[in-house]
């Protein structure tokens, strides 16, 4: 059992979506005490070829310098910061400039090859924040309360199939195309049937988490010319098991639910906001409406700005 949520401001302007998502996820804390995560879109304000790297580094002498040297082989480092974290690790965040998006994944793999270092994400149009602990602990550690954006997705995790650490927390990201993220509640029971064709196409999996499989599946469909709605509709046909998930893109969010409707999901909207979550109590954190709609079995919905 996990909690998922998404919120989109219809005017496409910057709003306090970090605070909104923090409250929405806190209302779902009972669904997942292990870890929590956010993908906040639209607020980074990076230049066209700039990316933000989010890197977990063990706190030991010389290791951060090695990470910086590896990054600088590809790009000069712009602004950067070190966020003290937990369990003898730090989070190193830095802005880089690349000639093309195709350079991003190879750079991440080079950084990941350093012992005791792992890249949590690299993005252009969204900021990813995820860690172990409660929603409010993470919110205070990374100051999600102050984050501005146009839309966001988030997750509270109750682990059932993989280890509990910062890297396995949701959202998951794919580098097949830029800035695609997924949060997920449930299990994909035909995981290997979905994964193996993607690997044969050259897509690289870093974990055995089925959420990573979903995000690569959706990104692969988008790269093949599917619309987001078409990709989600095909996923409902192809994937087995109980699931509901939310995908984040630079343009908005998409929602999909398994054909038997075995995982909860509700949505609502008013003139300003569209929101979706595992439970109604989460929606109430961002709007006051009596018109809450249940997501039907097999339903797909896309809301883009």
Swiss-Prot record:
Tell me its EC number(s), please: 2.4.2.-
Main enzyme class: transferase
PANTHER family listed in its UniProt record:
AMIDOPHOSPHORIBOSYLTRANSFERASE
One Pfam family, short name please?
GATase_6
- GO molecular function terms attached to this record: transferase activity
Residue ranges occupied by any Glutamine amidotransferase type-2 domain in the UniProt entry? 2-305
Its source organism is Methanothermobacter thermautotrophicus (strain ATCC 29096 / DSM 1053 / JCM 10044 / NBRC 100330 / Delta H) (Methanobacterium thermoautotrophicum)
CDD domains this protein is in?
GlxB
Q: Which SUPFAM superfamilies match?
A: N-terminal nucleophile aminohydrolases (Ntn hydrolases) (SSF56235)
Say yes or no: keyword Transferase present: yes
Which residue positions are annotated as catalytic?
Answer: 2
Q: Which UniProt keywords apply?
A: Glutamine amidotransferase, Transferase
Domain of life the protein comes from: Archaea
Q: Does the keyword Zinc-finger apply?
A: no
Entry protein name: Putative glutamine amidotransferase MTH_191
């Amino acid at each position: 059992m996990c909690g998922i949520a998404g919120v989109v401001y219809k005017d496409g302007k910057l709003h306090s979506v970090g605070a909104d998502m923090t409250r929405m996820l806190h209302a779902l804390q009972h669904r997942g005490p292990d870890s929590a995560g956010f993908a906040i879109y639209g607020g980074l304000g990076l230049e066209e070829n700039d990316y933000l790297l989010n890197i977990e580094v063990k706190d030991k002498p010389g290791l951060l310098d090695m990470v910086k040297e590896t990054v600088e082989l590809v790009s000069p480092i712009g602004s950067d910061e070190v966020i003290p974290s937990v369990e003898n690790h730090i989070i190193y965040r830095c802005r880089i400039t690349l000639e093309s998006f195709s350079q991003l994944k190879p750079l991440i793999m080079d950084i990941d090859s350093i012992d005791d270092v792992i890249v949590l994400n690299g993005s252009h149009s969204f900021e990813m924040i995820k860690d172990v602990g409660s929603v409010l602990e993470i919110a205070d550690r990374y100051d999600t309360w102050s984050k501005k954006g146009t839309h966001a997705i988030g997750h509270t995790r109750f682990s059932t199939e993989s280890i509990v650490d910062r890297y396995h927390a949701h959202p998951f990201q794919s580098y097949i195309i830029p800035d695609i993220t997924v949060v997920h509640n449930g299990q994909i029971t035909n995981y290997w049937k979905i994964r193996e064709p993607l690997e044969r196409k050259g897509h690289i999996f870093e974990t055995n988490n089925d959420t990573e499989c979903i995000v690569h599946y959706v990104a692969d469909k988008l790269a093949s010319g599917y619309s987001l709605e078409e990709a989600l509709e095909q996923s409902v046909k192809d994937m087995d098991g109980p699931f509901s998930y939310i995908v984040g893109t630079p343009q908005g969010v998409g929602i999909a639910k398994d054909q038997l409707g075995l995982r909860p999901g509700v949505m609502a909207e008013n003139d300003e906001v569209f929101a979706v979550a595992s439970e109604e109590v989460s929606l109430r954190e961002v709007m006051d409406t009596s018109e809450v709609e249940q997501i039907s079995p097999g339903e797909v919905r896309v809301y883009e700005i």
